[in-house]
C-alpha cells in the first residue's frame, strides 16, 4: 500500500485512469490526515491474521481487509458459509478496539472464480465486497486505493454525522418487541412475526427489531413487496393465530392493496409501522401526512385503527392508545411515526405502562337460554337434515363440533374462504359426516345432493343450515339472499352482533365455544332422528360427478389433473400419514383444488375477503418457512402474472438466513392461458366465445434444477398427470418445486355455478335439466 501511494510507479502502472485515481486520493489524504502512516499485515489465513494484529505494538484503526479467496481456500459462493465464518473468526480474534472498526464496507474479497458469469448466477448484498481478481495490476491497485480512501473519509469525516444520529436501541422497536412478547397465547398459536420492507428512514428501527426478534426466536419474514408482507401476515394469523409487526417506509401506506381490508375483517392482531415525514415538511418526498393529503383519512374510511406518533416526548401515551386498540380486536393498528420518533432511543420499561400492556379481562359471551332452546329442539327432535358450515376453529372448538356431529348426525362443510376448517381426514381417521365444501364456487356434489332433490332445494322444514363463526358473506354459499331468507332455515353463531345476518332465522350472539358446549350438554337426539340423518349423509355420493375427469386428452382438463392428484393425496394421507397446508389462489385452479382435494388441516385461501388474485402466492414464503408440514399451493396463471416472483424470497430466507424448510413446498402454476372463471361467466351469460380481455400470455420456461446450499429449487412441466411421478414430487424434502401444469379451459363441473348442477355429465339428471333444455328451443 505504501508503494502504491508513493510518487514513483512501475511502467505497468503508467495508466491515465490509475494516475488520476492516485492523484485524487493523495489530494484528499495529504490535507485531511497529514502524516498518515499505513501499516500492512499479511497472513495465510484469517486466524493467523488476527494473531499478527494482536502482536502488533502499534495502536491503529483497521482500515482495510483484503482477502485472496482462492489462495486462502475460501468459497465465494453466496450459499457457502466458509467465507463468512472465516471473517467472523478474524473479527473474534481482533483486539476490542480494532474489532469496533472492522466493517463490511472495508472488507474486499478477490477470487479468480468470482467471474462475471459466476456473479450473475446469484447476486445478493454480502457483508463484504466481492471482486473478480483483475487481470491487470493497475486495476487491482486503483481499486484498493479507492477502497482505502473511501474508508478513511467515511470513518473520519463521517464521524460528525454519526454523532448526530441516535445512540442506543430504537425506543419504538424495544417497546413493540416487549409488548408482543408479554401477550398470552395458546400452545397452538404461532409466535409473533416480524415482516419488513426496507426504507431509509425506517432502516434503524428495522435493524433493532430484526436483532430483537432473532434473539427471542420470533420469525423474521421478508417479501418481494409491501403487499406480500400483508399477505404473509394474514396467512399466519388465519392458520396459526400469529400476531405481527410490519414495518414499511414513508408513503407506503397504500401499498398493501385490499389485503389491508382482509386483515381488518379477519380481526388480525398486529402493528403496521409506517414512517411519516416531519410535520413541518413542505410537500415532502414520500409523505404520509402533509398539506396535499392526509392518509389518516384513508385509514379512518377503511375502519383501520391508527395512532399518529409525531412527538418523541409522548411516545408512551401514543403506544398506550395503540395497545388499547390492539386489545380491542379491530384489526391491525397503524403506527404513523415521524423520523424524530423513529430515531428516539429508550427502553421498554420507560415506554410500556403496565396497565396498557396487560390485556383486559374478557368474559366469554355466553349463549342465552332463549337462543339455545329452539336450536336444541332442532338438533334433538326434528327429522331435519342439518348442515354446519364452520369458520376457523381452535382445537377445543373442533373437538366439540366433531363430537356433536357424530352424536347428532350433523353434516359438516368447510368453505371456499376457510378451506380445511373441517375436513375428511382428521387425526388419522375419516370423518363420515364431512360432505366437502359449500361456497359461492367449489360447492361439492355431495353438498348439493344433500340439500337438493330433483334439482331443487328440499322443503324449508326438512333442513337447516348452521353457520358457525361466519358472517354468511356472499362467498359463503351459492344461494341468493332471497333464497337464504325464504327457502332455507338458518342458524348463525357469531360473537360480533354486527355480523348477524338479516336472513338468519335463529341468530345466536355468543362465543362459539360457549355455544358448542351448551349444545353438547343439551344433546338428547332421538334415535330415529339420528338414524334418518346418518342415512341421508350416507346416500350422498363422493363423486367428481363428471366424465371428463377420466379423459386423457392433452392439454389436460382441470378435472382430469385434480382427479389424479386427489388419488395420490388420498394414498399418501391414508397410508403414509402425509399432511400438508393448502394455499389456494383466486381462479379456477384454486376452486378446483378446494373442491376436489382431500385436506389434512386448515388452509389459506385467497378467496377470503376481497378475493385478491396473487394474495395466496405472496403468502407462500411466510407459510412455508413457519409451518411444520408440507405446503401445496395452487396458483392460476392470471394470479401469477399480477405479483412478484417469490423464488428469491424463499431462497434468501432458507439458504442464506438459515430458516430451513421443514418439508416439501410445491407450487402448482395452473396454466390455461386465460382468466378462466371470468371466461366461464362471460360464456355462460352471453354464449360468446372468449375475448381478448380474458387472455393471459404465459412464456413457459424450460425445466431446470438448481441447488442453493442445502435447498433444491426446481421447475417442472406437468403435461400429463398420469405420466408424472406425483408421489415423488410431493415427498422431496428441503425442495421447492414450481410445477407448470398445462391445462385446457372448460366450463364443466367444480361448482362454478348452481347451473352446473344441471349439466349433462352429472351422475344423476333431474327433470329440471330437460325442462330447461326444452324451454330454450
Predicted segments, located by residue:
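Glycine-rich, anion-gripping cofactor-binding loops and their flanking helix/strand elements
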Residues: 71-73, 77-94, 227-230, 234-242, ...
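Conformationally flexible catalytic loops at phosphate/diphosphate-handling active centers
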Residues: 155-168, 217, 293, 299-302, ...
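N-terminal cofactor/phosphate-binding cores enriched in small/glycine residues
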Residues: 165-262
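Active-site diphosphate/adenylate-binding microenvironment
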Residues: 168-210, 538-627, 775-777
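Thiamine diphosphate
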Residues: 215, 279-291, 422-425, 591-777
